[in-house]
Amino acid sequence: MRYGFTTGSCAAAASKAAAYMLLTGKKKETISIVTPKGIVFETKLLDITRKEKSVSCAVEKDGGDDPDITTGALVYAEVSYTERSKTFHTETSLQTETKALHATIEIDGGIGVGRVTRPGMDQPVGNAAINHVPRQMIEAEVLEVCRMADYKGALKVIISIPKGVELAEKTFNPR
């Protein structure tokens, strides 16, 4: 059986790649991360866009031999320089490390990423519906790049799945 990778893994890989290209100015064609299960995920980067203060790129979701509705969708990450927010709180286990590094990573959802609408979910009402494990993965990968580039400022990561709006209409939770 051929393994696929989660949407969260795709988001983390795209985030790492966009952060790398932003902080180093170098282009990447592929990127690899290690998933929480210890599996190396190497993937090709698509639709790379550079702006003055941000870089975005996409990773194509591959569901392997057990595909779901998101298989084939492009998962985008845009990483940009931002000001530190006094109200921002990542809610991850990496908070202590983040403070020690003096780097701040803010994670939000863009087009095609739902918002939490009811209490009791993994994230507070109003937040992007990106659960804590993918958030931890994204933060860890971006922090790794920050350490490598000796960057101690603030970065904002926006995860988008343009096809997500269309895909959500085919599920039990179209919001």
Regions from the language model: what does each represent?
Residues 1-175:
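Generic N-terminal targeting/processing segments that precede catalytic cores or assembly contacts
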